[in-house]
Amino acid sequence: MRKRREGTANNSPTPEVTRVRTPRKENHEVLATVGSLLGSKRVNLQCMDGVVRMGRIPGSKNKKMWIREGDIVIATPWEIQDSKADVIWKYTRPQIEWLERKGYLK
């Protein structure tokens, strides 16, 4: 018979979020919601500044970030074309709750 580890129950509370990455204005970063997946590392983004952009997931983040519809991400709009952006960060559920409490998300 195996011993059961303490604290491994599924009903344990979610960890408290202490640090959350916020968009940096000096880098022109904006919060965005993933609208739809377009395929080929591309997504439709509804940005918080009111612009709908086509987002690109860079190759360095492709395998590390699994993005689904409805996820909250940080996007950096392109300097050349404002209708396109790079996805640079994806938030987890506790981080999204923190953003909502602090007023970053409407």
UniProtKB/Swiss-Prot annotation:
Per its UniProt record, what Gene3D superfamilies does this chain match?
Nucleic acid-binding proteins (2.40.50.140)
S1-like domain location is 18-92
Glycosyltransferase keyword on record: no
Q: Extract the GO molecular function terms from the UniProt entry.
A: RNA binding; translation initiation factor activity
User: One Pfam family for this entry, by name?
Assistant: eIF-1a
Q: Where is this region: Disordered?
A: 1-24
Under PROSITE patterns, the record lists:
IF1A, S1_IF1_TYPE
Q: Which CDD domains match?
A: S1_IF1A
Q: Which UniProt keywords apply?
A: Initiation factor, Protein biosynthesis
The protein's role, per its UniProt record:
Seems to be required for maximal rate of protein biosynthesis. Enhances ribosome dissociation into subunits and stabilizes the binding of the initiator Met-tRNA(I) to 40 S ribosomal subunits.
Q: State the family named in the UniProt similarity comment for this chain.
A: Belongs to the eIF-1A family.
Q: What's this protein's name?
A: Translation initiation factor 1A 2
* Provenance organism: Methanosarcina mazei (strain ATCC BAA-159 / DSM 3647 / Goe1 / Go1 / JCM 11833 / OCM 88) (Methanosarcina frisia)
Q: What is the lineage of its organism?
A: Archaea, Methanobacteriati, Methanobacteriota, Stenosarchaea group, Methanomicrobia
